[in-house]
């Protein structure tokens, strides 16, 4: 690479980041003089950068004059972990989309509502036309039915009290007894209950205290081949379950 094509770097930003790195290596704190010595920066420059970093919350100054990592860094760390988790989950969804040639959905049941957090589709695998909000169509979608299966009967009853099931297509199931009492299978399928011409399959994602599901949608004409979808869908749901278990949290977009 010739000099003219090298990126323009801002030296003060590089110095500030180096200070953050060194402070992070000293859990008990480190003084400005030691920081200057460790980084090779002039002491006046070190003080100037430290004042700025403290003002912005990236460092904190202790009573004895030592500097420690500030709350802003903790926030960045949490955000980075959440973004990495979302990236890992999305990669799994992309692989599943390519494997099954179907649109992929990740959804949760949170605070009494169905929330679709992620959709991975493409021009050749378009998402279902959400002509009715998924929050009001849990009874008619594999996504919603799988999530509701993770609730108690009382919670399902409460859901349908707030969102009475309505006929969305001639194939929509609206009977409360069946929707509330009938146990859902481990893998849920809806056949044109939400949208004519479209079928959907959903598998539970295992995470404590939060119903989550991974689902696919595809043209109903492919129903005859759905048994080929079962193993990849379950495997992807298990991979996401393991990612969430390691992270210890769900990457909510709220």
Language-model segment annotations:
Residues 1-83, 241-242, 246:
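N-terminal helix-turn-helix
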Residues 9-13, 70, 82, 86, ...:
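Short, structured helix-loop boundary elements
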Residues 24, 148, 152, 234-245:
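Short amphipathic alpha-helical signal-transduction/dimerization elements
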Residues 59-60, 106-107, 205:
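A structural signal for short hydrophobic beta-strand segments in well-ordered beta-sheet cores
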Residues 168-243:
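Extended hydrophobic
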